Amino acid sequence: VYGGLSAMKALSGPFGGIKFIPTGGVNAQNVGEYISAPFIHAVGGSWLCSKADIAAHRFDRITELCRRARAAALGFELVHVGVNAPDADASMELCRMLDAAFGLGVRPGNSSNFAGSAVEVMKAPYLGASGHIAIGTNSVPRAVAELEKRGFAVDPSTAKYKGEKLTAVYLRQDFGGFAIHLVQK
């Protein structure tokens, strides 16, 4: 499709059941944007594997470019840190303290309160002895597949969906007293 993401988005309206596999116009800087679009199935392109690198047998370079592309496509980044508080009062007290110290603001919630967007304070102990670390990704299902290849497992009982799309899930492993919460950006 000529016209990049905007053209594919326009076509996905009347043809909602189709998925695209763009190979032109995709590069290391925009692969995350492409792969996070709901109407994109996969991406590719010659930027990953140049003819010169193939001819010169620079497979280490090609492997590194592919690793970087995969990292860019997944787009892992810290979203917030979750702290386990014993109860709702302690949760609000900690949020107010963080607000007083750093001017983050306080946002009350159902099962937790937030100090700004960086700190979530649970109203009751939840996963992780100390709390959780929320890691955002461009695609939770793709992140799960990648993490499983790396030897990590998800806890399916924690999965959250928007319609049929997986939008959040916790990993089973403990990371220094913290659970890892994968969330859709």
List the predicted regions and their residue ranges.
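Alpha-helix-loop-beta-strand connector modules within alpha/beta enzyme cores
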Residues: G3-I21, T63-A73
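Amphipathic alpha-helical segments
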Residues: D87-F102, A143-R150
